[in-house]
Design a protein with these regions (language model features):
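Helical cap/lid subdomain of alpha/beta-hydrolase-fold lipid enzymes
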Residues: 11-197
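Hydrolases whose catalytic domains are alpha/beta-hydrolase-1, hotdog thioesterase
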Residues: 5-9
C-alpha cells in the first residue's frame, strides 16, 4: 500500500513538482487478491484457526483493506457470474459500505499509468492467490470461498498488479517480503540512487 500512497502524493498532492523519479517495490497497483481473501475468509494465522473470525472482522474495519481491493473481476460465483469486489457491495455488511466507498474514491484518484518516470520492481514466479470462487446465498452473501494459487506473483501481489503501466520494469524471482534484501534489487537501487541528475 505504501507505493499507492506515494503515487497519491505524486499524482494528486503536487509531489510531481518535487520528485523526479520514483521506485515502486512490490506495489499492488491493481489490488491484492490475498488481501481480499482475508476479508472473505477467516485467516489461519494461529493454530486451529484460533481468533481467525475475530481477525477477519477487525480487517473489515481497516480503510486500507478496501484501498487494495483488486480493481478488476477476480471472483466467480456458483453461476459463473464474474465479481469485481471493489465495485460490488453485496458481499459486505451495511456498516462496512462507507469504507468501501472511501476505497473506491482513493483508487479513482490514482492515474492508470505513470505520471513521472517510475521503476516498478516486483517478484514473479511464486505461487500467489490469483482468483476466488464463491458460493452465495439468495441474499448475495458469501457462504463459502475457494481460491486458486498460480506461479504468477510474489506470494502476495500478482505480477499483473505489481507494475504500473508506462513504468520501467525490473522483475526478480523473489517473494514479496524478500524484495528489499534481494541482491539484484539492491544493485538496481544503487544504480538508481547514484545516477547523475
Amino acid at each position: 500500500l505504501g507505493t499507492m500512497v506515494t503515487r497519491y502524493y505524486v499524482e494528486s498532492l503536487g509531489g510531481d513538482k518535487h520528485v523526479e523519479r520514483l521506485i515502486l517495490m512490490g506495489g499492488p497497483h491493481k489490488g491484492a487478491v490475498k488481501g481480499l481473501v482475508s476479508m472473505l475468509v477467516a485467516p489461519e494465522i494461529l493454530p486451529f484457526g484460533i481468533m481467525g473470525e475475530r481477525l477477519r472482522k477487525i480487517l473489515l474495519t481497516f480503510p486500507s483493506s478496501y484501498q487494495i481491493l483488486p480493481d478488476y473481476s477476480v471472483g466467480t460465483d456458483q453461476y459463473g457470474v464474474k465479481i469485481n469486489f471493489l465495485e460490488e457491495s453485496d458481499w459486505l455488511n451495511p456498516e462496512n459500505l462507507p469504507l468501501l466507498k472511501l476505497g473506491q474514491d482513493f483508487r479513482n484518484e490514482l492515474k492508470p499509468s505513470a505520471a513521472i518516470p517510475y521503476v516498478s520492481i516486483f517478484g514473479y514466479g511464486i505461487k500467489t492467490i490469483s482468483s476466488v470462487s464463491i458460493r452465495r446465498d439468495a441474499a448475495g452473501k458469501t457462504e463459502s470461498v475457494d481460491y486458486l494459487r498460480e506461479n504468477i506473483g510474489d506470494g502476495s501481489v500478482l505480477e499483473q498488479s505489481a507494475f504500473l503501466h508506462g513504468s520501467e520494469i525490473h522483475p526478480v524471482h523473489q517473494h514479496h517480503g524478500s524484495l528489499f534484501v534481494d541482491n539484484d534489487v539492491k544493485m538496481r537501487l544503487k544504480v538508481e540512487l547514484t545516477r547523475p541528475y
